[in-house]
């Protein structure tokens, strides 16, 4: 394994050629303040203790690493372990980062939070920690996503957040990020931008990765306890990339194959997909340089996925770098492949995963049979499927797999 891998951003915030701080001058003071505050918090044992306290007592960590016996047997290859991020409070990995950033905001004396959300999971996690720490929260959410995720919108409002519909563009996650950044610029004195994925201007990709790395750290100690060795392969789905970077990061220098699974939407031969790595090229969006779905003129294209959490047109800078150096292999799953995997997995394991996570499972179903029975795969179940029941039901009804 190549030990010459860059695992921290350089002083300008780059991983290789990706990352940086492509923001208006007006935001630079806030970015500098955040970077300094985070550096201090990271080195402060008291901050880390407080974070650990809430992760354990409030979120319910550590999450189990569950051996999927029936699923493993059905695929007839490698042993499959599930990292159960679906069992966190609020039902997904998003809370790991929301909690960490809320504690950081509190430490910085910021009383208000602004966030963006796609599937609504990050919005719910942000609203949850805002309620916990008595902070105000404004959430920007694309109007299209609001339609798809009504239950999560109500959850956020019940928790005390103000949800603002974004009509611009295609009314999805990318447009919500634009609005959240604009809002932050004009409220920077008393507001922290609680960014939900491993992207945005430096230091956000590092902050989000660090708070999500608890996933990979737990996997490492849990698999060593259960199997006495590291896994052969680790699989996670990728939108912006926070659950994946949190899963992969503690294994970057180990001899473990890492697979990120992007959303191929209606297929990689169509223009309705979210393949930032698969079909994208480097460009700048939302304050950072990363792989993007864009046309020849550099116009960012609309991303598509049946999963509201994966239809983002970019993929964080650290993933972009790991792709270029060949450390992480990027695969994909179409809407249909993901939904079929979701149905199959649920019937075998009695766990309904989020559609996002089902993209990772779809690749596991292709990978496991090619490996030996002694091999070990860990797949991150990034969230539970409650929020997706309507989409799943519709999909099954349309195909005659369920009654209307």
Swiss-Prot record:
The beta subunit is responsible for the synthesis of L-tryptophan from indole and L-serine. This is Tryptophan synthase beta chain. One of its GO terms (cellular component) is cytoplasm. It comes from Staphylococcus aureus (strain NCTC 8325 / PS 47). It is an enzyme of class 4 (lyase). It catalyses: (1S,2R)-1-C-(indol-3-yl)glycerol 3-phosphate + L-serine = D-glyceraldehyde 3-phosphate + L-tryptophan + H2O. Its EC number is 4.2.1.20. GO terms for biological process: L-tryptophan biosynthetic process. Keywords: Amino-acid biosynthesis, Aromatic amino acid biosynthesis, Lyase, Pyridoxal phosphate, Tryptophan biosynthesis. InterPro entries: Trp_synth_b_CS, Trp_synth_beta, Trp_synth_beta/beta-like, TrpB-like_PALP, TrpB-like_PALP_sf. The keyword Oxidoreductase does not apply. SUPFAM superfamilies: Tryptophan synthase beta subunit-like PLP-dependent enzymes. Its cofactor is pyridoxal 5'-phosphate. Tetramer of two alpha and two beta chains. The modification N6-(pyridoxal phosphate)lysine is found at residue 94. It holds the Pfam family PALP.
């Amino acid at each position: 394994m190549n030990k010459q891998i860059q695992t921290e951003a350089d002083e300008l915030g780059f991983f290789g050629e990706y990352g940086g701080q492509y923001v208006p001058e007006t935001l630079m003071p806030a970015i500098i303040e955040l970077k300094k505050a985070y550096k201090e918090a990271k080195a402060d044992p008291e901050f880390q203790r407080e974070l650990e306290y809430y992760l354990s007592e409030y979120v319910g960590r550590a999450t189990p690493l569950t051996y999927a016996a029936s699923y493993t047997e059905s695929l007839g290859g490698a042993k499959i372990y599930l990292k159960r991020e679906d069992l966190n409070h609020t039902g997904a990995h998003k809370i790991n980062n929301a909690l960490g950033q809320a504690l950081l905001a509190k430490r910085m004396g910021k009383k208000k939070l602004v966030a963006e959300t796609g599937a609504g999971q990050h919005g719910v996690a942000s609203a949850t920690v805002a309620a916990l720490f008595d902070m105000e929260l404004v959430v920007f959410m694309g109007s299209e996503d609001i339609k798809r995720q009504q239950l999560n919108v109500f959850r956020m409002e019940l928790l005390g957040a103000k949800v603002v519909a974004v009509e611009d563009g295609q009314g999805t996650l990318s447009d919500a990020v634009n609005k959240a950044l604009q809002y932050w610029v004009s409220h920077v004195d008393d507001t922290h931008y609680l960014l939900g994925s491993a992207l945005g201007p430096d230091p956000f990709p590092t902050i989000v990765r660090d708070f999500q790395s608890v996933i990979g750290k737990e996997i490492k100690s849990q698999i060593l306890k259960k199997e006495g060795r590291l896994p052969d392969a680790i699989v996670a789905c990728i939108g912006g990339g926070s659950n994946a970077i949190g899963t992969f990061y503690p294994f970057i220098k180990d001899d473990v194959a890492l697979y990120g699974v992007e959303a191929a939407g209606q297929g990689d031969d169509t223009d309705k997909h979210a393949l930032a790595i698969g079909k994208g090229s480097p460009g700048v969006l939302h304050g950072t340089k990363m792989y993007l779905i864009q046309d020849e003129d550099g116009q960012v294209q609309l991303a598509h996925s049946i999963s509201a959490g994966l239809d983002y047109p970019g993929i964080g800078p650290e993933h972009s770098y790991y792709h270029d150096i060949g450390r992480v292999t990027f695969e994909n799953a179409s809407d249909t492949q993901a939904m079929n995997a979701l149905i199959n997995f649920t019937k075998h394991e009695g766990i309904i995963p989020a559609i996002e996570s089902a993209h990772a499972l779809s690749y596991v179903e292709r990978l496991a049979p090619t490996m030996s029975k002694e091999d070990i795969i860990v797949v991150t179940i990034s969230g539970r499927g409650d929020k997706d029941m309507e989409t799943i039901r519709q999909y099954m009804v349309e195909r005659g797999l369920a009654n209307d």
